[in-house]
Structure formats: C-alpha cells, structure tokens
C-alpha cells in the first residue's frame, strides 16, 4: 500500500481495475488475515486511546473529505444511480451474501460511486451465486459502466506502491499507533444505511464531517509527533502492563504476520495491507465483528475502559512507565557492565543491541518543555514585577545588639513595606548574614510576593524555616541580644599578651640577678677604695646620687618608647612580625609559604636548570619554581606582597636591598646597585662577631612596583632587569599590581609566578576587630563589614580609616560607619572596556548609582569614552524595550541624538578651549545613552573603529599630498584633482603592461614612472590609495616573478627627481636632563656625524659623481715630480 494514501496526504483517484483483479486472488487468504487483523485492531485500539474515543461517523467521511474537484458532478450521478437501483430492488431479493464479493469496498477512491457499486453488486446476487459484474446485461451493469467511463479521467495518477515496512522499518510498523484508521473505517460501514436515506442529510453530514475532520487533524498533529518520539518505548511498556496470555499471543501473531509479509515482494506487501485495512459489506462486517467479540471478549472490555479514560491520565501513565522502564534499563546495563568487568575477555557476550535507551529523546519530553515554558514565564514576570506596594507603612523595630549573629538568611520575592536592600542592611545591622541561594546552612527563608519557586522548593526539601515580612520583623523584635564572638576572641588574645608580658619581666630580673654578683663585687671593691681615700660622708652622697639617676633613666626610656608607639601609624604599629600574622597567608599552599620554600632552595638547585628555564620560560617551569632565578608577586594593593617578601628574607637570614618606585631604576643604576649588593656586608655582622664578617652569598634584591618602571627615569629598566635575571647569582623578588600590563608580559616568562588574592571579609574582620579592641575603639561587627567592603578589602586602607576615625571618637555606630565608608570608598581605576560595560549594565550593579556616579564613569577617560559608547550602544538589548522592536528602534534613535549632541559639545570644548563644558558632554555622551539603552550586551565591548578609520584617512591624505607634489611638473593640478581624475588612470597605465607583457613590460612601466617623477614608494602608494577598502589591489594579483623582475629593473637604474630626497630623522640633541653625560655626548657625536654625512656632496642624489680615469692627469704628474725633486735635493 502507498504510505501517502495511508496518511491521506494527497487526494487519491479511483482505484484501477487491475487492483480489483489482484484482490480477487487474495480473497482466499482473507479469512486468516482477518483473524490476525482483529488481533492487531485490539492491540492498536488499546494503544491509541485517543482515536478510539471519537465518534465512528467521522472516520468514514474521511474518504469524502479528500475528494477531487468534481464533487458536485459526482453527487448528481449518485442521486440518479440511487433512484434506478431503488426501482430494481423491488424485483430482486438479496440472498445469502458470499464473502468472495469483488466489488465490496475494493476501491481506494474518495468518490461517491463506491456506494453505487456496492449496492448494484448486492442486487445482482441470486440463490447465493454471485454473478460477474462485467459479464451481466442488467441495468445495474449499464449504470456502472456509465459511471466508470465518466470518472476515468479523474484518476490518471499512477503511484508506485510503497510498503509501510519499507518506509518505517519492521520495528516501527509493529508499534505504530496510526493503524487505528483502518478499524474505524471498518466500523463506519455500519452507518452507511443511515446516510442513504436522504440526499440532503448526506450534504449536511458532509459539511459537518469536514469541520470535525479539520479540527481532528489540528489536534492530531501534535499527538502524532509525540507518538513518533515515543515509538521505541511503547511496546515495552505494554508488555509490562499486560500480564494475560492473550496479549502475548496477539503480539506474537502480529510478529508472525509481519514476518510473512516480509517474505513476499513489495507490491504483494502493499496489496496485503490494503486488503487488510479495507472495509466490507454490513452482513460480512457483522459476522466478522461477532467473531472478533467471541474470540477476544477481554480485549473489547479493555477497549471500552481505554475509551472512557481521559487523555491526560493516559499520557501521564505513559510518561511514568517510560521513565521507570528507562531507569530499569540503565540499572540493568550498569549491572551487566560490572559483571563484564569482572569476567574474562572471552566471556563478554553482551550484545550491543540492548543499549537502545534514547537519552536525547527523554530531554525533549513534554515535562521538560513545560518546565522551560514555566521558567521562561517566571523570568519574564521577574523582569516586569512591581516594587513594594506599601513602602514605609510598617514600623521597623529596634532589636537587641547582635541578636541575629550566627543566623543566615535568604530573601526572595518582593517585600511589601521595605525594599530588598533595606531588609538586607537591617539583617546585617544585627549581625545576620544574607546569601543568595538556599543551602544547608540557611536558617531562614524570607519570602515575599512573586517569590522564586526553586528557592521555596529547596527550602521545603531541606526543612528551612520560611518567614514572611512580618515574621522577620517579629524575629528582630523578640530575639535576645548576644555578645559578639569577635569581641570575645579579642579579649582572649589580650589576656594571652598580658600573661606573656607578665612572664617576660621575671625572666629579665632573674637574668639580672645572675649577672649582678660579679658586678657587685667589683663595685664593693671600688667603694672600699673610695672610703679609704675620701670621707664616709662623700661616699654616702655619691651612692645617694647614683641611685636616683638610674631610676630616672629607666623612667625616661619607658616614656620615650610609649610616646613613639603613640606617634606611629596603625599600619606600622600593627605590622606583622612573622609569616603567621599575615592575613590570608596561613595555608600550606599559600603564596607566602611557596615563596619561603623557593628562597630556601634557591642555592640548592643547579644553575643548568635555571639557565634552561631562563631560555624556555614556561616550558621548563615547575610547581615549586626551583628552575626560576626570580619570583614575581602580583596582586591588588594592600594584600601584603611587600611585607611577605621582607619577612621571608628575614626568616631565612637574607639581607635584601629594596628598590621601589621612588628610586631611579634605569639600566646603569641597576648595574651599580646589583654590583654593590653583591660585595656589601651587613653592619649587623660586626656586632654579632668581633672580626669583620666575610662576604656571604645570602643577599636578595626586592624590586617593588615593577609595572611603574616607565619614562626617562627608568628607561630600559625592564630589559636590563630581564638581563640581570638571566645572569644573576642572587635571588630577585619582583612585585607588581597589574600582571597583565604590557611591560610585565615579557618579564613573566622569567619569573616564578605567585598571584596574591584579596583576603576574605571574615579574615580581615577578625584581625581588625582585635586591633580596635586593643585601641579601645567600639565598632559593631556589621559596621566593620561595611568599612572593609568600602576599602575594597585593602588591609592597609582599612587600618588608615580606623586610625582616622578613632582620632575623632572612640565609638562608631552602624549607620555612621556605613556613611563614612561610602565617603571614604577607595577609587578604583577602570579601563575603557570596563567603563563601557558599566555604562550600559543593568541590575544591582548600577541600581544605586547616583547621577554623579554615572557621570564619573565618563571622566575615567573623557577623550575616548564617547567613542566607546558610540561604538557599542548598538550591541545592547535594552530592558525598557521589553522585546518590542519598535520600542527598541525608538530608544536607538534617542540615544543616537544624544550622542550627536555630545559631539557638538565636544567640538565647542576643543575649538574654543571651553573645558567647563565637560560635565555637559558627560551627560549627553555617556549618561543619557546609558540610561536609554540600559540592558544586556550581546558581545564583549569592541574597540572604536573610528580611530582606525581616522588614522587611515590621515595617511591617505598625506599620500595624495605627496603624489600631487611629485607630479606637479606634469599635471599642474591640485590634490583633489589628482585624487579624483589622475590616480585611477595612472594605476591602470602602470599595471596593464605588467599583466599583459609580464617581465618585458617592466621597462615600459619604469619609463612612465620617470616621466611623472614617481618613486617606487609612490608606485605602492598609488596602488593603496586607488583601490577600494577590503579589495586587493591590481598589483597584488600579479605573478611574484614579474614583481621581482620589476623591482630589480627599477633598482638597477638611477632615477633623477626634481625634488630632494630627505630622510627625516628624529634629532636626539634635545635629550632630557635625566640622561647621563656620557650617553648625551655619545648621542651628540652620532648626530653630528649623521649631519656631516647628509651635507656631504658625494651623498647628494642630485649631483652626478665624477668617475676617476685610470690615467693620471698632467697636474698630478707635475705634483709628483716636484715632490720627487725636493726629496733628492734634501738628500
């Protein structure tokens, strides 16, 4: 059978007569096929619950819906045929109907003459013997022949039959749910007598059936696609469901039927399935129906239950059964893999056909699509949701101090009387912590309107307490106060330090007592001598005078030390004394410990490995850095890089020389410093041992702020530093802030890379609160959080801010600390790409930025910021548009107008030097476009293309100016005329001989160039200027051999030009004051020599050199003869 007819894709014509003859041959085996077909029907009806529940009339009329264009004509013929057949029916009585009826619904056409053929055939049977419709001479036969002759041209299409098995494959046909159409056609034959009663009823029924069929097709497409997606899983589910033997028998009978059909040829297959799906006469259908009901009573009952069940429950059951079966299959596969892993290779006989579970199809299930749809709708509602409706209506309670400390909160949705940020600051004010996602550590979920479904589901699964807005306020109101754990830790640390201080004086006193007896004996001897010499009164006075002096000295020393400590800054006062005290560097794999191990093993590693590393850089590097001669510490300021380097050197006993940005680090100064540091000895060695210490190798060089080596002061410093690293005999420690700086990229390959990260807020907070407790400064822990975040986690900046605020008052509240930290917020330098991203960014990042903050983005680099905005505003999807293209275009238009206004202001600033208009330009060029197009960028910010185009415009203008000057003696025209009228023709004249003649055309081109006084550079410039952008020039398409021949021919000859060929060189006479005198003298000598060479006559191209003849001239001979005579006369 044709698969296109099976699905009703095209309108089929009348069945040809040959097919009816073929069907007569297959009628003998029709009984057996019917039995199997009944089993198939039962199986299909169980799977296709949706189609079975529909009325039976619609399926019958499907043949009429896909009718040809001549429907009106056929209906008239049907009416006449019916009237004649009714007259004949009076004389004939139908006898027993035989099953071998060749006209019983054999035709596959969609026309109404099927009914005529059926009725006429039934009337022509007498005494149980069927008369041949082609041999009889009755009126019915005449009517049949008239109808056939009229309808033959309506079905001229001959279609090659295609089997369902060939189209879908054997497995798909076994499990196809679309065979429900055949059973419905059989059932619909019972209702044919009702449609014959009245012609008007037939027309009305046709119209109704057309509408019903269209609706059914609309709903059937989606179901058909889903059944195709679930074809491979359905049979397994039905096997699991059916425990009765009848289900197994039906499935096996279907398989037997299919195996028989496969043995035959493809046309036989088509006939077999076409006869199986055709309907037959009412009497025969009644018998077949009764036999089916008798054979399969349980399946008919099961079919009724399936028809009564709703669609949704059936689909859910199918999906659940499918998931269970796929899960069981995966478990079985995993178990088989484990067994096969334990078995030897010879026993691995598991077939690969078992791995048929379609994982990709499960991801495209209806549940997943529904989830995606709901997530999309939730996100859209999140973007469009309203703010608090009763803002400020509820009184915010005042809770106890640190009442929420140790509790973690998550806020979701919109709170009605308070903003989200205010709720977050309220929780943090009382010591609580607010996170973004629900986890096991979350104590409370504060839920508002339009809350997130995933957070609420996760909180319910983890057993997290859910609060509303009132519940949060009641919790703050009722929770008791707590003492901060940071204060308790600071007190414990203070007690430990006091106990240490109390123990240390006792040790000193014991040491003094041990040493004092020898001194006392010497002093007693002196006292005796003085007593003998002097009177006792004098000795008493001396003793009395010496004792108070010693006391005064101790007191003054203590007072001086206390005064010095008070004068010190907190940064120096609480500077770490050991590596353990550095914040954020306590771990074993921290950068401080890595540097310590690297420096300890620096002299142990062989110099060959270090040379190899210096040559090949990253390729020879190791995790411990043993192959590097230098280390590079990079990270943000205030994280302890310099402190780490100095403490590591002190701990290992290295003496170090530090060069920072305040020192001159040029090429010569680096040589001198390194040479001195290699030969120097520390003065500390003279005190430890009496003799002068020998020169040791335990020296180190610390180069701080390497990325700041620029300008005339440090010219050549980076290259000299790299050279020192290659040949150094001492370790070098370099430090920088920006590791991605262009100057550092070459240095990175020769250094052990150690990247410092900012410490966490908790690490900094505990150390700062202990320092504040020692200084008597009362700061609540939430206020300390704000101070640390305001300083961008810079430990040095936090200490400076604390010392400054402590000078005013010894207590800080949360609000005061938050306000002060915002005012003292550290300014961070942003690049142009970061500025552009922030100008158009939407969300929390820019939600609280004021107008001044937005205009400050413009002032990061006011010369290039407008260009970045103009280049990237087209790549932003604005939130205000909401996906509407018309609104998007309106916003683009307004942003473009604002950028144009900003350009007009910039023109006024540059032309009239009116720099007071810069804030106005900031509003037009940055703030307004950012507000209009605030949204999400679809790509990384791109560099302004205007800069490249402006540069190429200037270059081309300069080239055209030079060309017009060189050709002025021939063209006598302006620059514009040369550009528009001459260059294109000159280009063609220069390239055409080379393309047509090849190497031989080079001389012709050179002659033309000499005519117009053009140089080789002018030739290349003409090719560049006269070709359109992006397209290759005509000269570039030439053969390389021709180009080389042209270049050689041009260089052989001397070319005279009416203009001077001056080579512009940068004069180095005006050197900066930072250069040494030796270098400046060398530069001056080089410049004078170059000037003399330029002024020499021999080097001038316009003067022709004289060729010296081989014979000497007369004057030269006379001079030589005079010289010879003088020599002889002297002798």
Swiss-Prot record:
Query: What function does the entry list?
Result: Subunit of the replication factor C (RFC) complex which acts during elongation of primed DNA templates by DNA polymerases delta and epsilon, and is necessary for ATP-dependent loading of proliferating cell nuclear antigen (PCNA) onto primed DNA. This subunit binds to the primer-template junction. Binds the PO-B transcription element as well as other GA rich DNA sequences. Can bind single- or double-stranded DNA.
Chain residues that bind ATP: 635-642
Primary residence: nucleus
Composition-biased stretches (Acidic residues): 1078-1088
Q: Where is the composition biased (Basic and acidic residues)?
A: 38-54, 184-201, 334-350, 359-373, 1113-1123
Compositionally biased tracts (Polar residues): 127-138
Which GO annotations describe the biological process of this protein? Answer: DNA repair; DNA-templated DNA replication
Q: Which residues carry this modification: Phosphothreonine?
A: 109, 160, 162
Please report the stretch or stretches of sequence annotated as the BRCT domain. 399-489
One example GO MF annotation: DNA binding
Q: Where is the composition biased (Low complexity)?
A: 308-319
Q: Give the PROSITE patterns listed for this entry.
A: BRCT
Species lineage, top-down? Eukaryota, Metazoa, Chordata, Craniata, Vertebrata
Protein name as it appears in the record: Replication factor C subunit 1
| Entry similarity comment | Belongs to the activator 1 large subunit family.
Q: Which GO terms describe its cellular component?
A: DNA replication factor C complex; Elg1 RFC-like complex; nucleus
Task: Specify where the region named Disordered lies, as residue ranges.
Answer: 14-87, 92-111, 120-201, 225-378, 491-525, 1073-1131
List the PANTHER family: CHROMOSOME TRANSMISSION FIDELITY FACTOR 18 (PTHR23389), REPLICATION FACTOR C SUBUNIT 1 (PTHR23389:SF6)
Where does the UniProt annotation locate this protein?
Nucleus
Keyword Transcription belongs to the record: yes
Residues recorded with modification Phosphoserine? 68, 70, 72, 107, 155, 163, 172, 189, 244, 250, 253, 281, 309, 365, 535, 1090
